[in-house]
C-alpha cells in the first residue's frame, strides 16, 4: 500500500522531506498528494529546485497554477492558513507531516484529524499530551495503531538520544551535560534588527550566539529516568547547515576512550546502522552536509577523564538527517495500521 501524505509548511524541513523521499527511492511506499504553504506557488517550486545547502534537485520541477510537478508526479498546492479548512478528507490523506515549526499541540493535531487526516506527525517537539514522541532507531517500536498525533522530536534530540542510550546501556549514566553547536536558523537576523530575544537581535553571520534550548526536556521525555540529571545549553554559529553536539556524561562503570569508540563503532555497523555513523577521518562540518544519519560520532574527539567522565563529539545534518527520520517514522506509523482502538 502506498501511503498518501500531505505536508503542512514547506520550509527547510518540508522541502527536505520531499527531496529525501525522491532521493531515497521510497516513492513506491509514500506519495505526496498535497503541500500547504502560504507562500506563492512560483516561490515553492523555485526553492524546491534550487537550494543553497543541498544543491540543485535532480528531479525536474515545474509549477502550473496550483499544481507542483516533480518529474511526472503531480502535487496539489494549497495556501490555507486555517488547519480545520484543509481538504485532507477530500484528498484521502493518511498522514499529515506538519513541518510548520509553529504548530505542535494536541489541539493542532486534532484539527488535522477533524479535517480528515488519519494521523499527524509533527516535525518538532510537541506537548506532553501528544500520543507519542518518536526518536526513530530508539523507540519507534512503542508506537501503537491508536497513536494518531505523534512528534518526531527535534533534530538535536534525534542526534543525541541514540548515543545516550548506547552509553547508558553499556556503562550506566549518572548525569550529563550537552552543548549544541547549531547552524544559524530562520529565527535569527541577517543584520541587527529587533527580536524579543536580545541576543537574536544580532546579525547571525557575525557572532556565536547563545540561545535557549529545550533539549534537556527532550532527553527526559524519551528517557524519564534522567529527569533532573541532564542539562543542556545551545549556541548558534555562522554556518547555514550541520550541527555538532558536545555530550559529556558521568558513568558508573570505569571505561577507556578506546572502549567507548569500539562500542559506538560497533553500534554504527550493527544495531544502529543507518541511524548512527562513526568516523575517525579529519573532517569538518561541511563534510557532513547531506548526510542521512541522525548522528555521526567523531571518534577522534572522544575523551575519558578519571575513568568515569566521557566526552564525545557527535555531528548531524540537522536538515537532511531529520528529514529522513520523518520518512522513517511516517512508514512506522503506517505499518501498524489505521485502526484507532488499539
Swiss-Prot record:
Pathway: Cofactor biosynthesis; pyridoxine 5'-phosphate biosynthesis; pyridoxine 5'-phosphate from D-erythrose 4-phosphate: step 1/5. The record marks 182 as: Activates thiol group during catalysis. The active site is at 155 (nucleophile). Belongs to the glyceraldehyde-3-phosphate dehydrogenase family. Epd subfamily. HAMAP family: E4P_dehydrog. Its EC number is 1.2.1.72. It catalyses: D-erythrose 4-phosphate + NAD(+) + H2O = 4-phospho-D-erythronate + NADH + 2 H(+). GO terms for cellular component: cytoplasm. Keywords: Cytoplasm, NAD, Oxidoreductase, Pyridoxine biosynthesis. Substrate binds at residues 154-156, 200, 213-214, 236. Pfam families: Gp_dh_C, Gp_dh_N. It is an enzyme of class 1 (oxidoreductase). Catalyzes the NAD-dependent conversion of D-erythrose 4-phosphate to 4-phosphoerythronate. The gene is epd. NAD(+) binds at residues 12-13, 318. This is D-erythrose-4-phosphate dehydrogenase. One of its GO terms (biological process) is pyridoxine biosynthetic process. Homotetramer. It is found in: Cytoplasm. GO terms for molecular function: erythrose-4-phosphate dehydrogenase activity; NAD binding. Gene3D superfamilies: Dihydrodipicolinate Reductase, domain 2, NAD(P)-binding Rossmann-like Domain. Its main location: cytoplasm. Transmembrane segments: none annotated.
Amino acid at each position: 500500500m502506498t501511503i498518501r501524505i500531505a505536508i503542512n509548511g514547506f520550509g527547510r524541513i518540508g522541502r527536505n522531506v520531499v527531496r529525501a523521499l525522491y532521493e531515497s527511492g521510497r516513492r513506491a511506499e509514500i506519495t505526496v498528494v498535497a503541500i500547504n504553504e502560504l507562500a506563492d506557488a512560483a516561490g515553492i517550486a523555485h526553492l524546491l529546485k534550487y537550494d543553497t545547502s543541498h544543491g540543485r534537485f535532480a528531479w525536474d520541477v515545474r509549477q502550473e497554477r496550483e499544481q507542483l510537478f516533480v518529474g511526472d508526479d503531480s502535487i496539489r498546492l494549497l495556501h490555507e492558513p486555517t488547519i480545520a479548512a484543509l481538504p485532507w478528507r477530500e484528498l484521502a490523506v493518511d498522514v499529515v507531516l506538519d513541518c510548520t515549526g509553529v504548530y505542535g499541540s494536541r489541539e493542532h493535531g486534532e484539527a488535522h484529524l477533524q479535517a480528515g487526516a488519519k494521523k499527524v506527525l509533527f516535525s518538532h517537539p510537541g506537548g506532553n499530551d501528544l500520543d507519542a514522541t518518536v526518536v526513530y532507531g530508539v523507540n519507534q517500536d512503542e508506537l501503537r495503531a491508536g497513536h494518531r498525533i505523534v512528534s518526531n522530536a527535534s533534530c538535536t534530540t534525534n542526534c543525541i538520544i541514540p548515543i545516550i542510550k548506547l552509553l547508558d546501556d553499556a556503562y550506566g549514566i549518572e548525569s550529563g551535560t550537552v552543548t549544541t553547536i547549531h547552524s544559524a536558523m530562520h529565527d535569527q537576523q541577517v543584520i541587527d534588527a529587533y527580536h524579543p530575544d536580545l541576543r537574536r537581535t544580532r546579525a547571525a553571520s557575525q557572532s556565536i550566539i547563545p540561545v535557549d534550548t529545550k533539549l534537556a526536556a527532550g532527553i527526559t521525555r524519551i528517557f524519564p529516568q534522567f529527569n533532573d540529571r541532564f542539562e543542556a545549553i545551545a549556541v548558534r554559529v555562522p554556518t547555514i547547515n550541520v550541527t555538532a553536539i558536545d555530550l559529556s556524561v558521568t558513568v558508573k562503570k570505569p571505561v577507556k576512550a578506546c572502549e567507548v569508540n569500539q562500542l559506538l563503532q560497533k553500534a554504527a555497523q550493527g544495531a544502529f546502522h543507518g541511524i548512527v555513523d562513526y568516523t575517525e577521518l579529519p573532517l569538518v562540518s561541511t563534510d557532513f552536509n547531506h548526510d542521512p544519519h541522525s548522528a555521526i560520532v567523531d571518534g577522534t574527539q572522544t575523551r575519558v577523564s578519571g575513568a568515569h567522565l566521557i566526552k564525545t563529539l557527535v555531528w548531524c545534518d540537522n536538515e537532511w538527517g531529520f528529514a529522513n527520520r520523518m520518512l522513517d517514522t511516517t512508514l512506522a506509523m503506517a505499518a501498524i495500521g489505521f485502526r484507532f482502538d488499539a
